[in-house]
Amino acid sequence: MNTIEKPTEKAEILLEALPYIRRFYNRTVVIKYGGHAMVDDELKQSFAKDVLMMKYIGINPVVVHGGGPQIGSFLKKLGKDSKFIQGMRVTDEETMNIVEMVLVGKVNKEIVGLINHAGGKAVGLSGKDGSLIRAEKYYLSAEKAKDTPPEIIDIGLVGKVKEINADLITSLVRDGFIPVIAPTGAGDSGETYNINADIVAGAIAAALKAEKLILLTDVAGVLNKQGELINTMNNMEALEMIHEGVIEGGMFPKVKCCMKSLREGVRKAHIVDGRLKHAILLEMFTDKGIGTELVL
């Protein structure tokens, strides 16, 4: 009995995935890879296999990675504190040098190696390579008293995306490569900017008119006041939760970049739990999916 049921169950799982494989064939999916999924060995292997499977069945994955824990660990070893405002890392010149060294020189190469070892053709890029990401300085704003202008906060060499060289990514994808992108960018005067990886992923997804933007994080998705998972959330609901302070910290730029990417042509955006093995496949190829789906 069991010997018959088990193969049958596997067949049913494959059949459940079939309409999604058909729907996403030859479409681009941008994945922001970050959090616990980057430091747990089992999850790293799971991620590489998910990306490889997508490529094998005709989907075009583009990976944008973070590296916050690795940067924080390196800064700590050097006796330098990490400071965050509204989920953004305050970045002076010394910190920027460390950020670039860790993101581009270490983390990016490790991810490329993981995917290639699994059988893929990954190529690593920073935003400075081939003028992939043109950036400009980013300032935060904080609301003050009613009827007074917001406070402008300078957080150093933190940038925002000015322009994406989509042709470079498209060319690599067309040649069978899986682009793996570190979130740094170059300013007009040649200065290097640290850019939030979620924001970079959203901008790249918009530039490519991607089918999906998937952000991997260390929580189940977007949570309500009671700490319960929100399965689907629209733009108005997101704005209300931001105003009420329910969406804050590191989740704030994630939700913000998802909504911006949707307005700029991305079909769907998802914030999912990267602590789950095969989180990407569960989101893309099952009826229920996981995490929070964001819509306009």
Curated annotation (Swiss-Prot):
It catalyses: N-acetyl-L-glutamate + ATP = N-acetyl-L-glutamyl 5-phosphate + ADP. GO terms for cellular component: cytoplasm. One of its GO terms (biological process) is L-arginine biosynthetic process. Signal peptide: none annotated. It is found in: Cytoplasm. Substrate binds at G67, G68, R89, N194. Pfam families: AA_kinase. The keyword Nucleotide-binding applies. Catalyzes the ATP-dependent phosphorylation of N-acetyl-L-glutamate. NCBIfam families: argB. This is Acetylglutamate kinase. It comes from Syntrophus aciditrophicus (strain SB).
